[in-house]
Amino acid sequence: MGLLDAGITQHNVLITSVDNVLNWARLSSLWPMGFGLACCAIEMMATNASNYDLERFGIFPRSSPRQSDLMIVAGTVTMKMAERVIRLYEQMPEPRYVLSMGSCSNCGGPYWEHGYHVLKGVDRVIPVDVFVPGCPPRPESLIGGLMKVQELIRMEQIGLSRADALKKLAEKSVDPQFVIERERKAAGA
């Protein structure tokens, strides 16, 4: 539900809740900070290129954690790098979200069994809101994950915890490939 879907009275007065206005503003101007560590970073960069154009979703990448509300961890997180991931996460203002992109950041990837130096998932050091699977995931998958973050923001309420919002999001899950194909068809028509 967008802000314009709310009720409008005869005198052009918008009637909605404060939650809806705040959530609409936050999801319409998502500022991610990419933390590219391996081959997933190449796919993340491709997603920011003109072929996929993330700005049409209101997503504009930032280079500073103090200006970001979303951290995209893309690639292999080693034990030494985990400290820096935590530091950057702590520098982000609230509300902050984390998207884990790729098998390596999700669960250690091909290094999970024999890589003593690899963190077995970035969720062991910072809370992760959305996981994007793949090795490396395609840009379409990352866009689907970003749309999941936007849905999570849309479902947040002042009295609702993030865990409850994540449960509601899981119940309303939609295949991201379907959404991308629908947008491509609409753009071509």
Swiss-Prot record:
One of its GO terms (molecular function) is iron ion binding. The keyword Membrane applies. Disulfide bonds: none annotated. NDH-1 shuttles electrons from NADH, via FMN and iron-sulfur (Fe-S) centers, to quinones in the respiratory chain. The immediate electron acceptor for the enzyme in this species is believed to be a menaquinone. Couples the redox reaction to proton translocation (for every two electrons transferred, four hydrogen ions are translocated across the cytoplasmic membrane), and thus conserves the redox energy in a proton gradient. Its main location: membrane. Its EC number is 7.1.1.-. One of its GO terms (biological process) is electron transport coupled proton transport. NDH-1 is composed of 14 different subunits. Subunits NuoB, C, D, E, F, and G constitute the peripheral sector of the complex. The gene is nuoB. Belongs to the complex I 20 kDa subunit family. Pfam families: Oxidored_q6. One of its GO terms (cellular component) is plasma membrane. SUPFAM superfamilies: HydA/Nqo6-like. It comes from the Bacteria. The keyword tRNA processing does not apply. It is found in: Cell inner membrane. It is a peripheral membrane protein. It catalyses: a quinone + NADH + 5 H(+)(in) = a quinol + NAD(+) + 4 H(+)(out). Its cofactor is [4Fe-4S] cluster. InterPro entries: NADH_UbQ_OxRdtase-like_20kDa, NADH_UQ_OxRdtase_20Kd_su. This is NADH-quinone oxidoreductase subunit B. [4Fe-4S] cluster binds at residues 39-40, 104, 135. Keywords: 4Fe-4S, Cell inner membrane, Cell membrane, Iron, Iron-sulfur, Membrane, Metal-binding, NAD, Quinone, Translocase, Transport.
